Swiss-Prot record:
Binding site for ATP: G10, P11, A12, S13, S14, G15, K16, S17, S18
Record NCBIfam families: cmk
The protein's Enzyme Commission number: 2.7.4.25
Full protein name: Cytidylate kinase
């Protein structure tokens, strides 16, 4: 691999997405949110469209840019649509299929052809095991729930319960259980600002670039 990969993993609402986008801008690296692949599969499945067929026919295109990942379907930007809760539920079902998951990992790797900040579950353990540097961004579940509540509103208790349930489900998956890569640098963001997390990540990154 002739390019640098900054792999950032971690549970939901740990702050990994905002940190990853900012690091991408600082470094001038493309940004790849790998979870959007699962969401795109779920989105197309709801329309009875095969994901890999859509990719092959160029109906579905992933644009990896500095600070953002765009998903284009039939010339329309569907990136925002993919962030909706119903799509997330569909994506979770897709992630439970081990035979499909392996094919997805191969596809995700094929999209990265330049220096990149790659963010998402299993990035350090399965997708890019040989990444230049790996981070595992974590935070206390209550803090993660509070962040999502402040961002999206709704019921704090419901959000916390969903996060705890998601954590439990991911850790106990029979195939590809969610875990920290052994060589990943763990950062607990519970009592840290986004700027503090970014600065700490950059300190580590500068040592390996």
């Amino acid at each position: 691999m002739n390019y640098k990969i900054i792999a950032i993993d971690g549970p939901a609402s740990s702050g990994k997405s905002s940190v990853s986008r900012e690091l991408s801008k600082i470094l001038g690296y493309i940004y790849f949110n790998t979870g959007l692949v699962y969401r795109a599969i779920g989105f197309l499945k709801s329309k009875n469209i095969d994901f890999f067929d859509a990719v092959e026919k160029n109906r579905l295109v992933f644009e990896l840019l500095i600070g953002q990942t765009k998903v284009i379907f039939d010339h329309d930007d569907i990136t925002k649509e993919l962030t909706k809760e119903y799509v997330g539920a569909l994506a979770s079902e897709v992630a439970k299929e081990p035979s499909l998951r392996e094919k997805i990992i191969v596809f995700q790797r094929s999209l990265v052809k330049d220096n990149a900040v790659v963010e998402g579950r299993d990035v350090g353990t399965h997708i890019f095991k040989d990444a230049t540097i790996k981070f595992f961004i974590d935070a206390d579940p209550k803090e993660r729930a509070l962040r999502r509540y402040l961002e999206e509103g709704g019921s704090y208790e419901d959000i916390l319960n969903k996060i705890l349930k998601r954590d439990e489900t991911d850790k106990n998956r029979k195939d590809y259980p969610f875990r920290k890569a052994e060589d990943a640098i763990q950062i607990d963001t519970t009592c840290m600002t986004k700027e503090e997390v970014i600065n700490l990540c950059m300190e580590y990154i500068k040592k390996v670039l």
